[in-house]
Amino acid sequence: LIFAGMSSLFSRVGFMVDAFSQEIKNPEEIFNAFDIRYVQHFLVVWSHLILGFVILVFGPFQFIPWIRNRWIKFHRWNGRVWLLCGAVTAFTGAFIGVVWPFTGHQGFGLLQATINAIIGPYTLFCLYKAYSCIRARNIGAHREWMIRSFALMLGVATQRVLMLVLIPLTGLGAEVMFASCMVLGMLINISVGELWIKLTRTPGTGNRHWKELDRKIAL
């Protein structure tokens, strides 16, 4: 999913660079309904893309146990940066999807706007809970809210993978499948995230990793 997200991100970056490298008098005549949003609202888009890149690159480091154990300062500072970038990216992503759904505010465009209006604030809530839990030294809950927030952020990558598979299979266009795959992608990631949390939850504050507990029981 990281690579799928990166592929989608670099595709949009390439489009933006190409679009602004040429003089275009009337963008409406050149770009389709999906692409023109990137041109007309480039400041919001660039902030979303750049900080999204930071999330995809540095996010996985937060979930590697030996980095947490050996380089705790890096883990803490990386976490702060990641939380900040995640908050801005969640807001800009929701803002774009709610205010400028590429099929308008009717039909599947309304579905796109609705799912963004739900997922955006929920992602911000997960990030807030992750921060507040670690401030309270509740490591177990912090870990769980971090998993939830990252699963939500990777939902767009899952959406893109689903679109690559389902559009050729169904013969339906992107106008229909974009919102549908977004809903399905988010549901898949939320479900997998919650399942992983349930399978790896530790008692108490979660200061010890579940594998360590299993080792002690085995011994």
Locate each region found by the language model.
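Alpha-helical membrane insertion/targeting regions
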Residues: L1-L219
